[in-house]
């Protein structure tokens, strides 16, 4: 079972640490979204090729943001390309079954996982939000590509 406490996944009573890549941060206005990743060879196999990764995404709004900047996450999209060039696109409503609402100074953080058939893959991701002050106004937040390595 996977538990996560303060940035450290705990799996089978072992403590692991996420890799925080300073390049893998999306920023738009008052919104910052850093991504941290971790390869877990303990849950991976060579035959068949099955490489397990977990990741942590933190969505935060500056404490100095105006109240009308409050938003809700509506939609997520990601495109995963493995080392052989195979591509998979996934999209859905919310993230991990939730539609977080974030306002000034607030943080929403979630942990998820993925498996790949090659030792490295890269992911392109974006989220779509709507602002409460103007329901018709939305924002697309794109992430830099981030790479998964075993």
Question: Where do the language-model regions lie?
Answer:
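Membrane engagement elements in two modes
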Residues: 1-52, 64-66, 71-74, 82-109, ...
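Short, well-ordered beta-strand segments enriched in hydrophobic/aromatic residues
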Residues: 53-61
């Amino acid at each position: 079972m996977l538990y996560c406490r303060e940035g450290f996944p705990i799996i089978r009573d072992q403590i692991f640490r996420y890799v925080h890549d300073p390049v893998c941060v999306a920023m738009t206005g008052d919104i910052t979204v850093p991504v941290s990743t971790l390869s877990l060879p303990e849950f991976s196999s060579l035959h068949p090729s099955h490489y397990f990764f977990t990741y942590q995404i933190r969505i935060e709004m500056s404490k100095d943001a105006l109240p009308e900047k409050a938003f809700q996450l509506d939609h997520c999209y990601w495109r995963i390309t493995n080392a052989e060039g195979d591509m998979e696109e996934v999209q859905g409503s919310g993230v991990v079954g939730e539609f977080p609402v974030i306002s000034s100074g607030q943080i929403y953080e979630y942990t998820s996982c993925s498996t790949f058939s090659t030792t490295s893959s890269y992911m392109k991701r974006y989220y779509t939000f709507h602002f409460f002050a103007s329901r018709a106004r939305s924002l697309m937040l794109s992430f830099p590509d981030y790479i998964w390595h075993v």
